[in-house]
């Protein structure tokens, strides 16, 4: 309860997450794929999370840098904007945005595999790609399609 005597808007989400493990997984993945891309995107501008190699542009494959009309630093800033938008999109509509994040992660994996030294990060990002696809599948149950109403039951029928 809030101080106004009304139930907290998050109380229902937390109770449902405790009683329905799949819904709990959906909520955790949604929060993670909202916050983490936004934080990583912001870091493309502030470089607080990485200082080597040469900040974020050190993770950009040369062939991709050569394709970009921008400098590697500015290319990574564009990447940062895309990551921020992806995180916001997951917050708004994970049913669709999770597939966009998965495709984005696939692109990052291709980038990392095309030059040596970052295979461990590519493997980690593959795990994130699988988690994004899992979020998309869970969102098909818990996030209504555009123009449709949410399921009225706490545990929708899985087909």
Give the residues covered by each predicted segment.
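Short Gly/aromatic-enriched secondary-structure transition segments
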Residues: 50-60
């Amino acid at each position: 309860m809030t101080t106004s005597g009304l139930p907290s808007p998050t109380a229902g989400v937390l109770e449902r997450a405790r009683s329905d493990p799949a819904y709990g997984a959906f909520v955790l993945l949604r929060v993670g794929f909202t916050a983490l891309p936004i934080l990583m995107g912001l870091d493309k501008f502030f470089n607080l999370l990485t200082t080597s190699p040469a900040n974020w542009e050190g993770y950009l494959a040369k062939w991709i840098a050569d394709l970009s009309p921008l400098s590697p630093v500015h290319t990574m800033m564009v990447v940062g904007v895309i990551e921020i938008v992806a995180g916001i999109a997951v917050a708004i509509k994970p049913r669709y945005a999770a597939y966009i994040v998965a495709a984005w992660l696939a692109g990052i994996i291709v980038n990392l595999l095309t030059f040596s030294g970052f295979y461990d990060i590519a493997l980690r990002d593959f795990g994130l790609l699988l988690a994004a696809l899992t979020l998309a599948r869970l969102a098909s149950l818990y996030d209504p399609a555009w123009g449709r109403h949410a399921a009225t039951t706490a545990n929708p029928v899985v087909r």
